[in-house]
Amino acid sequence: MLILLDQDGVLADFEHAFIDAWRKRHPDIEPVAFEERKSFHIREDYAPELRGLAEAIYTAPGFIRDLPPVPGAVEAFRELLALGMDVRICSSPLMQFENCVAEKYLWVERHLGRDATQRLILTRDKTLVQGDLLIDDRPVITGAARPRWRHIIYDAPYNRDQTDRPRLDWRNWRNVLAGELYRSDA
């Protein structure tokens, strides 16, 4: 089985790192709490006059590279490989890609090992990537093609209105994926 894992928000803890960076840069302005998030794009959860401040954080040199792993993500990645799954990291770089692209590779190397950089797929359109499952926190994924993969939503406050697909986090991933493996054998 070919499993595609999104990077930001699934493997790398973008959300909490953003909040920490916001508090350091703007201690006088309260950040939007993770549980209060409504939009996949973090800047859209801020008032228009604050969106530039938000964007400056996640496009800053070192931000993507220095993201901590989502708790349980590295262990799940390694366990999936040990189970014989073909696991790839499928990530969309930011439109402001100057720092992001290289830093995604550096993040993978730091947390998953140099060999894992061979498993990194960067694309603006995930529908063009082949796979059986895509685990992604983006609630709706559209593009040029009808994807072959089944979208499993990685749980986040901004995607909880989507109830038509399986949902997982790194605490329940074994149960959710066991159901998907059974489903693929049918």
Curated annotation (Swiss-Prot):
Active site: 6, 8
Domain of life: Bacteria
One annotated GO molecular function: 5'-nucleotidase activity
UniProt keyword annotations, A-Z: Hydrolase, Magnesium, Metal-binding
Binding site for Mg(2+): 6, 8, 137
Enzyme Commission designation: 3.1.3.-
Function: Dephosphorylates the 5' and 2'(3')-phosphates of deoxyribonucleotides.
Protein name: Putative 5'(3')-deoxyribonucleotidase
Native source organism of the sequence: Bordetella pertussis (strain Tohama I / ATCC BAA-589 / NCTC 13251)
Lineage: Bacteria, Pseudomonadati, Pseudomonadota, Betaproteobacteria, Burkholderiales
